[in-house]
């Protein structure tokens, strides 16, 4: 039961893994509407008059809790993975294809996916000024847990759990949601020597699934089992606890099917400003500095289920016959059983329905410098700044990349720091309508002793990649008499 209890906390917390956008491609001037999600001003820099995204997907994972030994992401398709078992001498340190666990004091996990559906942007000149309008559809998953006490490390190290252990406060959030966004960008300050750009995204949020767990206090005590109990496991009890869990899901646990419906709604806002230095006769800039704050807002799940466990009975977690070898058919059955142990009432922990989840607010800065024709070096900094209570959190990210970008082809290489400590290398390749990339490419292709992170990006777009700057100049109206 202890493992069920902790795994439930992890699932509810770890589900907040933040999707990491492919910054190398999004720095490409031809990224168009795809770049609006991280910088509302970037579509303004697209030389093409229109741009359409058919489908793009970005998946990001990073954790220091578990790993697969001596494997790559591509190699997983043909691998048989077994879980570490110290009693059988199965360990990731002595064989490959083992799901094993780090024995660190703290556990961290960041995961996310970001799918951009049919989206479109176009530019227009109104009273001799350029405006860009766009609309996009998006499906997002964010989940994370940061600095959670790793109680499992005692079992992993084959040592007895301490007689008394107090968890430090922890919280975690996970959310699946859809998004319909409107992008608008225009130039401002026309008298300035530099070109200033203002960009805005207004978003309608469609809540699908969410979970949030807050652990303000939890104390675990352990003692030796009696001769009639499982002598390989110590008895573990929860005391002095103050825990709350909220969730809502479209997964039907009876039919074991996902049944799509909207469970929440909200409004989101992205704001951005950029300044560029360029010759008015050229499309390409000399340098650019952009700042944006994205994902201001929250999703309200009015019918969400809330459970609170505080100041109840001592809960026997491990070796308790009520829990051992029992399979729970749904989260609600698990919480009702836990409530019976805590309060002698299956419904005592149930509270008023409804909760809110904040969007993964972050500030983003970008500096781009042209080195020579079609060659650019870019620096990006993304810092999470949660605004609302119970917000999902994205990962902090520092990225530098070198790009070569032309109308029909573009490519680049990058180096990144995730959470300011994990160094990753990657890049992207764009040819016509196809874009492939990764900000952490090595785990995709090469075996890692401890495979614990990965990143992949793919997009299919329609845009006039057959066009070029000379053709566009020829089509412009000549102002020869002035």
Annotate each predicted stretch with a short phrase.
Residues 4-14:
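Sec-dependent N-terminal signal peptides
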Residues 20-482:
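Subset of outer-membrane beta-barrel
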């Amino acid at each position: 039961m202890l493992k069920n209890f902790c795994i439930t906390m992890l699932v509810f917390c770890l589900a907040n893994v933040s999707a990491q956008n492919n910054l190398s491609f999004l720095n490409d001037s031809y990224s168009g509407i795809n770049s609006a999600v991280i910088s509302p001003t970037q579509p303004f820099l697209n030389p093409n008059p229109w741009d359409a995204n058919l489908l793009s997907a970005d998946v990001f994972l990073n954790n220091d809790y578990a790993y697969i030994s001596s494997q790559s992401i591509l190699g997983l398709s043909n691998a048989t993975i077994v879980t570490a078992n110290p009693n059988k001498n199965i360990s990731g340190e002595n064989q490959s294809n083992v799901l094993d666990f780090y024995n660190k004091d703290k556990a961290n996990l960041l995961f996310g996916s970001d799918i951009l559906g049919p989206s479109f942007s176009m530019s227009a000149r109104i009273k001799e000024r350029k405006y860009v309008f766009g609309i996009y559809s998006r499906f997002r998953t964010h989940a994370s847990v940061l600095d959670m006490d790793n109680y499992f490390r005692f079992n992993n190290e084959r040592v007895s759990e301490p007689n008394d252990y107090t968890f430090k406060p922890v919280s975690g959030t996970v959310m699946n949601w859809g998004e319909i966004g409107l992008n608008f960008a225009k130039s401002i300050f026309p008298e300035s020597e530099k070109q200033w750009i203002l960009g805005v995204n207004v978003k309608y949020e469609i809540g699908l699934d969410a979970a949030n767990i807050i652990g303000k206090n939890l104390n675990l005590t352990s003692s030796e089992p009696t001769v009639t109990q499982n002598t390989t496991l110590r008895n573990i009890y929860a005391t002095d606890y103050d825990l709350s869990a909220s969730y809502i899901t479209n997964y039907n646990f009876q039919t074991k099917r996902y049944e799509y419906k909207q469970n929440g709604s909200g409004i989101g806002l992205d704001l951005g400003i950029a300044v560029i230095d360029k010759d008015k006769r050229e499309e390409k800039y000399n340098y650019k500095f952009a700042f944006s704050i994205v994902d201001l807002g929250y999703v309200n799940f009015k019918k969400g289920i809330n459970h609170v466990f505080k100041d109840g009975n001592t809960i026997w977690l491990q070796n308790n016959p009520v829990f051992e070898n029992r399979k729970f058919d749904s989260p609600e059955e698990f919480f009702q059983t836990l409530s019976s142990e805590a309060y002698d009432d299956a419904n005592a922990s149930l509270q008023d329905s409804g909760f809110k989840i904040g969007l993964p607010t972050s500030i983003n800065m970008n500096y781009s410098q042209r080195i020579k024709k079609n060659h650019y070096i870019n620096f990006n900094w993304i810092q999470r700044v949660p605004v609302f209570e119970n917000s999902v959190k994205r990962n902090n990210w520092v990225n530098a990349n070198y790009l070569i970008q032309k109308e029909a082809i573009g490519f680049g290489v990058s180096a990144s720091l995730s959470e300011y400590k994990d160094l990753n290398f990657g890049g992207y390749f764009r040819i016509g309508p196809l874009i492939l990339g990764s900000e952490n490419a090595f785990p995709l292709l090469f075996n890692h002793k401890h495979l614990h992170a990965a990143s992949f990006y793919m997009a299919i777009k329609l845009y006039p990649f057959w066009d070029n700057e000379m053709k566009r100049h020829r089509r412009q109206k000549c102002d020869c008499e002035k």
